Amino acid sequence: MIKLKFGVFFTVLLSSAYAHGTPQNITDLCAEYHNTQIYTLNDKIFSYTESLAGKREMAIITFKNGAIFQVEVPGSQHIDSQKKAIERMKDTLRIAYLTEAKVEKLCVWNNKTPHAIAAISMAN
């Protein structure tokens, strides 16, 4: 009887942990963060600008509709584990711009200007 109760409890615990596991899409991922919102774009990047100038180290992308987003270049304000992810995002955006890939959605932090990219979803 005790084994049965433990088995049921463990199964319920495991099921609920799995249900809240890895996000299945950008909307689920974005919902895990505060101060974020989803932008649905379905368009290619119109311009890509990269700045290494002092306090304005960032990559900036724009779209035809006028939307502007940024990715900060890793600096002293970032911990080591963030630096590689930021560099990968910057590289992804540069490649998307050069190959004219369509950006489906962006999850952005809306408490920065321009909005800072947290996640990207692209579609062919």
From Swiss-Prot:
Q: Name one GO cellular component term.
A: extracellular region
Superkingdom of origin = Bacteria
Q: Which Gene3D superfamilies does this chain map to?
A: 2.40.50.110
Q: Which SUPFAM superfamilies match?
A: Bacterial enterotoxins
Q: Single GO molecular-function term? A: host cell surface binding
Q: What start-end ranges are recorded for coiled-coil regions in this protein?
A: none
Question: Which compartments does it reside in?
Answer: Secreted; Host cell membrane
Q: Name one Pfam family in it.
A: Enterotoxin_b
- List the cysteine pairs that form cystine: 30-107
- Give GO BP annotations, semicolon-separated: positive regulation of tyrosine phosphorylation of STAT protein
Per the record, the major location class is: secreted
Give the result of residue 78 to A, as annotated. Answer: Loss of toxicity
* Keywords from the named record: Disulfide bond, Enterotoxin, Host cell membrane, Host membrane, Membrane, Secreted, Signal, Toxin, Virulence
Question: What is its biological role?
Answer: The B subunit pentameric ring directs the A subunit to its target by binding to the GM1 gangliosides present on the surface of the intestinal epithelial cells. It can bind five GM1 gangliosides. It has no toxic activity by itself.
Q: How does it assemble?
A: The holotoxin (choleragen) consists of a pentameric ring of B subunits whose central pore is occupied by the A subunit. The A subunit contains two chains, A1 and A2, linked by a disulfide bridge.
Query: This chain belongs to which protein, by name?
Result: Cholera enterotoxin subunit B
Native organism is Vibrio cholerae serotype O1 (strain ATCC 39315 / El Tor Inaba N16961)
